[in-house]
Amino acid sequence: MKDVKALKLMTLNDVLSQINGDMTLGIGTGSTMELLLPQMAQLIKERGYNITGVCTSNKIAFLAKELGIKICEINDVDHIDLAIDGADEVDPSLNIIKGGGGALFREKVIDEMASRFVVVVDETKIVQYLGETFKLPVEVDKFNWYQILRKIESYADIKVERRVNEDVAFITDNGNYILDCKLPKGIDPYKFHEYLIHLTGVFETGYFLDMADQVIVGTQEGVKILEK
């Protein structure tokens, strides 16, 4: 049986086939992108592509620069041709949860700008409903994070925790906190997102709804391509 890393690497050829010529490329954050990015950089170099990357986190921008990929800031581009990113969960409608790496706001900005948004996952990320195996991240202001937590818990039977890293509160690249929400089955993601996004102090949610154009899945049987 292949491990998760092997399943992710299986998707490599399908990911690389999306990259060509002159392109502004949105580069996602997380373990999948960190695994695939060196091969993407090698392809760009070998084929002489004129690729400019727009990165979703400081961490991935540092790695991309080290690999020789030309990087620019989001405000330096008018459009993004293709965004490639991982996901924490994908449901049957290709709605996804992202934000395990804490970069959900910047990921959403870049993925929404992209003409095409391709998601790369292994089969463990495919679920029947959002929240089945992964907590929904919500990026919030430090000032009133606890009041937001209480309001989220009052919405339904939701357990909410402020994210910590080695006993220290996790801070996003935007200087905010992350609240991780364990969702019960039956939560409507559209309604819950609307509730959250209208709470004062909520920066963004980890719901990426109706955004993915294609999901590339590494499975024990091979690569599966999911499209709407």
UniProtKB/Swiss-Prot annotation:
It catalyses: aldehydo-D-ribose 5-phosphate = D-ribulose 5-phosphate. Pathway: Carbohydrate degradation; pentose phosphate pathway; D-ribose 5-phosphate from D-ribulose 5-phosphate (non-oxidative stage): step 1/1. Its EC number is 5.3.1.6. The active site is at E107. Substrate binds at T29, G30, S31, T32, D85, G86, A87, D88, K98, G99, G100, G101, K125. Homodimer. Catalyzes the reversible conversion of ribose-5-phosphate to ribulose 5-phosphate. This is Ribose-5-phosphate isomerase A. The lineage of its organism: Bacteria, Bacillati, Bacillota, Bacilli, Bacillales.
